Amino acid sequence: MAITLQALSEAHIPTILEACADWPELAQYGPPYWRPRSSAELRRKIADTAGPQPARAYSFVLADSDGRLVGETSIHAIDWRSRVAQVGICIWRPSDRGQGYGAAGSRTVIDWAVGHLGLHRLEAWILAGNSASLGLFRNLGFVEEGRLTQRYLVGSQYMDMLVLARITGA
């Protein structure tokens, strides 16, 4: 699966807003701090990535072999002293999920985080019911380390958040 990471930029905003139009469908898989996509929120992410270095977060879009944007990934909540960060991945459209984009994008951003940033530990916080993401990160060598009971409200139901981690050796 060929996937390219591109630093999030102003040119990507219209495509992202269109792809993320069904926010309730997307948000059910996301972390507690997710907000509906807006131009302002995306510009903040661009500024975080392009701002003073080293940044506390880096955001990328995923492009398939034809250049079509299919999702986003990030290295965020970076603790530079301990060289620890969280990794996130989102494939926007249901029709693009299960095609290998998430695995290819995650491998690429993890390799970049270890090789370029020198991060020692990566974490993935995933809803307990998100079996696709749990399987993806377990296949990438992440191990479940904890459960945050009733951490995230989905609709009217509280869900557990699982914390998975991988020691990179960097």
Language model segments and positions:
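A short helix-loop-beta-strand connector motif used in the catalytic cores of GNAT acetyltransferases and
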Residues: 47-61
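Conserved GNAT-fold acetyl-CoA-binding loop/helix
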Residues: 25-47
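Acyl-donor (CoA/ACP) binding surface of acyl/acetyltransferases
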Residues: 1-15, 21-23, 59, 63-170
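Short helix-loop boundary/capping segments at the starts of domains
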Residues: 22-25, 51
